[in-house]
Amino acid sequence: MTIERVGLVVHGGREGAAEAAREVREWCDENAVACTDIDVWSDTGRHSAREEVDAAGDPDLVVTLGGDGTFLRGARLAAENDALILGVDLGRVGFLTEVPAPAVRSALDAVRDGGLEPESRMLLTLRASRLLEIPAEMEALLRYGRGPLLPPPRVRTDCESGDEWGIALNVTALNDVVLEKLSRDRQISVGVYIAGRLLASYSADALLVATPTGSTAYSFAAGGPVVSPRAEALVFTAVAPHMTFDRSVVTAPDEPVGLRILERSGRAAVSIDGQLRGVLDPGDWLGVYAAPRRLRAVRLGPMDFYGRLRERMRLTDAPAAVADGTPAPLWPVSTPPPGDLAHLALPVPGAEGASGDLLREQS
């Protein structure tokens, strides 16, 4: 593909970030590609994704240097501009970043030469009963986490708004949308609707709706299922619900999840991909659903999601199982699969993938 401008998002606190950023800038100079730093960590002002993308000159490739948190901040910008995103891994327990720092030049070469197929990831978006805002008197109390508070999401001008369908917000989430309590001594009470039908009224510390990508983040920590990022689904999970039913619910991608704060509940904070975006009052509601746009992420080869799951979650074999034998490959990978298996996602004989090739080049 033709790369005309790179937007560079750097987590300066990560070891190796400065060197990796220098490599990206040098590559851009050598290839006559404009490169603009996008500071998502500064607390000197609040900018919408559109404003940040415009200031960076509408990059067609966003490169993030850091961990999953840095990738999420870059994804917010890439989704706004329909740009590709390339995550360089400088983190510790990441599922989103793809490229080890020593391979960043090779990865950029591969993107430039068009030898890679972007991976499409589901995004979430919102409708709400009103605009999301953070009350001025509560702002100081709600400044948790790293990075600046973001401005309230704007209204989407290309969508009908008002009446019983609420306001369409110009915001996307790659991981999750979370509704959480503001008071330490009181849970929030929320009516949960799936595909327009009441599932149940919950009293919980938080309620979240995750994408398959986000299933290994907060949803996983709250007891939710691990979902392949290739799947098309929404995952609803309650955090510390005060009720017998404490299971997650996995919905189809065309089944929206509605969250209405009950009239005598406390207020609730709304976080999108870990960043606080507003506070809702009793009677307010959110509708969370699959966005029409997708995130296009650079993938260097077929993703070994389950190998990464085993590695990053430090999965170990049950001692009783180990005592009973050593697992062997279920199917051989030295020959092509038979016809009835040809449509399945299975290893291809002799094709380790571009990711392995890049790693070997750096060794």
From Swiss-Prot:
InterPro entries registered for this protein in UniProt: ATP-NAD_kinase_N (IPR017438), ATP-NAD_kinase_PpnK-typ_C (IPR017437), NAD/diacylglycerol_kinase_sf (IPR016064), NADK (IPR002504)
Primary location group: cytoplasm
Gene Ontology cellular component annotations, sorted alphabetically: cytoplasm
Pfam families per the UniProt record, alphabetical: NAD_kinase, NAD_kinase_C
Record-stated family: Belongs to the NAD kinase family.
Name listed for the protein in its UniProt record: NAD kinase 1
Gene3D superfamilies reported in the protein's UniProt record: Probable inorganic polyphosphate/atp-NAD kinase, domain 1, Probable inorganic polyphosphate/atp-NAD kinase, domain 2
Keywords: ATP-binding, Cytoplasm, Kinase, NAD, NADP, Nucleotide-binding, Transferase
Keyword Glycoprotein belongs to the record: no
Named cofactor requirement(s): a divalent metal cation
Protein's cellular compartments: Cytoplasm
Documented EC number(s): 2.7.1.23
Superkingdom of source: Bacteria
Function statement: Involved in the regulation of the intracellular balance of NAD and NADP, and is a key enzyme in the biosynthesis of NADP. Catalyzes specifically the phosphorylation on 2'-hydroxyl of the adenosine moiety of NAD to yield NADP.
Catalyzed reactions per annotation: NAD(+) + ATP = ADP + NADP(+) + H(+)
Entry annotation: catalytic residues: D68 (proton acceptor)
Keyword Kinase applies: yes
Record-level Gene Ontology MF annotations: ATP binding; metal ion binding; NAD binding; NAD+ kinase activity
Amino-acid positions noted as binding NAD(+) in the UniProt annotation, renumbered to this chain: D68, G69, R73, N175, D176, R186, D205, A240, Q275
BP GO terms, sorted: NAD metabolic process; NADP biosynthetic process
